[in-house]
């Protein structure tokens, strides 16, 4: 049995380490340019519908469902290449890799993401994040429901969870309580949505950019949990 580490850092991918909003903007522009605005809008309608059904973003699955509406359009065969070959490394937030190196001086760094089993791993690999965390990558449909599995794979006395979604931070905090420090980088459309900011309690620590964490020492991260304890 693996002895628990003192601390393990669990980092989300999309809009935490990688600007996924910008990836989506590029995809929208590509669809409009290659297929026209109507086809672009149809793809995103299918994408949103599928995300509601599956609980995660499935870009390739949406493309497959889109294709069923027009099997004669051979241009769609090249559409998957745009997604699979996209230069994800250029969409990392400034300082993202530096943060991983910084945190690694105190404990294991693990990517903890939601997504499909094809496109999401590809994104993490091509962005350089897979290598940065030495292959410690977990991808689930609903990661907040997989905490026992996470703890079994990477046992630790304390976890630091870094995620752009206050909903996720809150749900995991409610389960792990003082065993986890929640860190909220205010990046991406979820993090900046006024409804989300009022619907959920604040994280233990909030930073404006992921790169700001390079200035945080381990005592500051661990102390953020203790500082909020009396108010919970």
Predicted regions and their residues:
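Active-site neighborhood of HAD-like aspartate-dependent phosphohydrolases
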Residues: 1-45, 68
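Short hydrophobic segments within beta-strands
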Residues: 12-13, 112, 162, 185
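Conserved Rossmann-like nucleotide-cofactor binding loop
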Residues: 16, 23, 117-118, 167, ...
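Substrate-recognition/cap helix-loop segment adjacent to the acidic, metal-dependent catalytic center
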Residues: 97-110, 114-138
């Amino acid at each position: 049995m693996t002895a628990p580490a003192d601390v393990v850092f669990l980092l989300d991918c999309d809009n935490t380490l990688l600007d996924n909003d910008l990836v989506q903007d590029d995809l929208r522009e590509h669809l409009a340019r290659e297929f026209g605005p109507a086809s672009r809008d149809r793809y995103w309608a299918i994408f949103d519908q599928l995300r509601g059904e599956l609980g995660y973003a499935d870009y390739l699955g949406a493309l497959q469902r889109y294709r069923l509406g027009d099997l004669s359009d051979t241009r769609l065969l090249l559409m998957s290449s745009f997604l699979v070959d996209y230069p994800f490394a250029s969409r990392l937030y400034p300082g993202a890799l530096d943060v991983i190196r910084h945190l690694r001086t105190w404990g294991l760094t693990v990517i903890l993401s939601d997504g499909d089993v094809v496109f999401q791993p590809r994104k993490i690999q091509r962005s350089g994040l897979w290598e940065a965390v030495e292959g410690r990558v977990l991808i689930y449909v609903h990661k907040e429901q997989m905490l026992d599995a996470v703890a079994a794979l990477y046992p630790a006395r304390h976890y630091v969870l870094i995620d752009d979604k206050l909903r996720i931070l809150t749900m995991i905090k409610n389960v792990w309580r003082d065993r986890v420090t929640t860190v909220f980088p205010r990046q991406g459309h979820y993090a900046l949505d006024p409804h989300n900011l009022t619907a959920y309690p604040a994280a233990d620590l909030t930073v404006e950019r992921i790169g700001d964490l390079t200035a945080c020492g381990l005592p500051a991260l661990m102390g953020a949990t203790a500082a909020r304890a009396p108010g919970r």
